[in-house]
Amino acid sequence: MVKEIPQIAAQLYCVQDYLGTVKEFEFALDQLHQIGYRAVQYANRGVLAGDNPELSLVRAREAFERKGLVCSSAHRPWSALRDNTDIEIERLQTLGCSYVFLNFLEQPYDMHEADSYRRFSIDSVPVIQALEDAGLQIGFHNHSHEFQRNGPDGETLFEFMVECFDERFLFEPDVYWISNGAIDPAEVLARLKGRIPCVHVKDAEVIPVEGDGA
């Protein structure tokens, strides 16, 4: 008997190679359900890619429901949320998502500079409010570069983000990338208590490499 995993979602980005056709998409959902997943995270890939995807979002949600899955959250680009807020809200509501996460700061921001995060913290407030009015919440998914010590006082960019972002802005800590940034994930999770609706967990392989020095 397959053990059900009701609170763990599969990120569709991780199975993007199996989303190329509607048939493959439905097969991938079957496999995820058989493994024990009961939720997925939307990714703009395969038949779901683009503003007018081959598989409409209505049909995608119907497919999720047929396979016994819900769409818990989505990754979307900031430019789409900023420039087409109402359309993005409709997209998220159609999928049945409660949360939307950004993968990184895109142009005109510089993802390696603290001032860009400061400017974003101001620019993002109207979108945060619009999403909140629609019953949705927004957050940030980290990689490793946010743990560079490029903050104004020598702190990490991530710590700077936590301090300067609107308190309604949430986080989706990726423990793999936190570790890759030479930070203890447990410390980050404790620091973000109350602002974490989702966590990304993935495998990491330790590959022994012979270096050229200390």
Language model: regions and residue ranges:
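Acidic-and-aromatic substrate-binding clefts and catalytic sites of carbohydrate-active enzymes
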Residues: 16-23, 42-56, 76-85, 107-112, ...
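Alpha-helical scaffolding segments of alpha/beta enzyme cores, especially the outer helices
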Residues: 27-31, 55-66, 86-94, 115, ...
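Short, basic, helix/turn surface patches
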Residues: 68-76, 97-107, 125-133, 168-173
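Acidic/histidine-rich catalytic cores of soluble enzymes
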Residues: 10, 39-40, 131-214
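Generic beta-structure capping elements
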Residues: 13, 103-105, 202-204
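Active-site groove signature of glycoside hydrolases
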Residues: 95-115, 134-146
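N-terminal pre-domain/capping segments
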Residues: 1-99
